[in-house]
Each structure stands twice: as structure tokens, then as C-alpha cells.
Design a protein with these regions (language model features):
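Conserved catalytic motifs of ABC-family nucleotide-binding domains
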Residues: 173
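Conserved ABC ATPase signature
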Residues: 152-156
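Conserved ABC transporter NBD signature motif
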Residues: 81-89, 97
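Catalytic Walker B motif of ABC-type/P-loop ATPase nucleotide-binding domains
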Residues: 177-180
Length: 201
């Protein structure tokens, strides 16, 4: 299951006139295969999500949840439909759409020999954020990893690694964050802690 978080890191609660920060109209994705025929991963999906809203996408494996995220992330090309993210049209402004989205993947894939601070600095660099404009320490505090900022990623607990993935998704201050099955494979206590961090956002 995928949890969709719509946020403004600085002042989400100050926006009284909420607008649709994510708008999906008749989104369709068909995977063509000459041997097995066409697979309709998404069929005329319509969705509007407002700023500040927490929204969940629920469904079994193969329901198209990951395909939906990958289309917005730019790694899968849609067959038809309109996608608007933070006011940017996916067809006309794909780079701006990608910059408006942060994704917390299900799989924990972190370089074990880099510290959380180093990983966030590298991530910021990928988005072209100048050093003077980076908010690395703020993000580390937001996910309660400031004390582990200079530790090797391999030394972090499972919960800390999950929070570090969340920090990576937030480092470029996107207005939309996707969490792909954030509680998969974790115990009850860790699950509660993860949701606590989500609510704090």
C-alpha cells in the first residue's frame, strides 16, 4: 500500500485556501505484449488531492499503485490522460513535476559507508541545490537523526534507516511526498514510531 503525503515543510498549516496540488484526469497506462496481450495497469484514473491532505492508495499487488507513482516520477510513460503536479503539467514540464515530488521507497537501499549528512548532501547536489541553500541539519532534526548525522549508515537501526529514506525524499523540499509501503517488514513499535514521524510532517 502506498501512502501519499501532501505537505509544505515550512508552513503547511498557514494555507487557508487549499487548492489541488495533485490532479489526475483519465490517466491510462497499457503495457503491450505480443505474446500475452495488453495489460491495463491504469484505466481512466481520476484523482484530486489538496495541499495538506494525507491520502492513501490501497489495493492488491498488480493494482497499478507503483505504476501510478512511476508515471509521476517520470520513469514510466503514460498511455493517455492528464497529470498536474503543483501546477505543472507532466507533458509540458516534466522536470518541474519530478522536482515537486519526493519518494520514500519500500526497499532500504543506502550506501553503508556514507553518513546521513553526506547522503543528504549528495541528494541535494543531484537536485542542483547550492550549498548555501541546503537545509540538511533541519531535515535531520525533522526525522530525529541529528545525533546520528555523522555515523555510518550501516550502523543505523532499521527504524533509523527508514527515517533516513524519508529525509532523502524531503531534502529538496518537495510539496508532495510518496511513501511506498513504509511499514512493510517492521514490528509494531517501529510502525508506531514511523507514523509519529509522518504526523509530525
Amino acid at each position: 500500500n502506498i501512502i501519499l503525503i501532501i505537505l509544505n515543510i515550512i508552513n503547511v498549516l498557514t494555507h487557508m485556501d487549499k487548492t489541488n496540488i495533485l490532479s489526475i484526469k483519465n490517466l491510462k497506462k497499457i503495457y503491450s505484449n505480443k505474446q500475452t496481450g495488453d495489460t491495463h495497469a491504469l484505466n481512466d484514473l481520476n484523482l484530486d488531492v489538496q495541499e495538506g491532505e494525507i491520502f492513501g492508495l490501497l489495493g492488491p499487488n498488480g493494482a497499478g499503485k507503483t505504476t501510478f507513482i512511476n508515471i509521476i516520477a517520470g520513469t514510466v510513460i503514460k498511455t493517455a490522460g492528464q497529470v498536474s503536479v503543483h501546477g505543472f503539467d507532466l507533458d509540458k514540464n516534466p522536470r518541474q513535476v519530478r522536482a515537486s515530488v519526493g519518494i520514500v521507497p519500500q526497499e532500504v537501499n543506502l550506501d553503508p559507508f556514507f553518513s546521513p549528512r553526506k547522503l543528504l548532501e549528495l541528494q541535494a547536489g543531484l537536485y542542483g541545490i547550492k550549498e548555501k541553500d541546503r537545509i540538511t541539519d533541519t531535515i535531520l532534526e525533522l526525522v530525529s537523526l541529528e545525533k546520528q548525522a555523522n555515523s555510518y549508515a550501516r550502523s543505523l537501526s532499521g527504524g533509523m534507516k527508514r527515517r533516513l529514506l524519508m529525509a532523502k525524499a524531503l531534502v529538496h523540499q518537495p510539496p508532495i511526498v510518496f511513501l511506498d509501503e513504509p511499514t512493510a517488514g517492521v514490528d509494531v513499535q517501529l510502525r508506531q514510531n514511523l507514523w509519529k514521524n509522518v504526523r509530525l510532517l
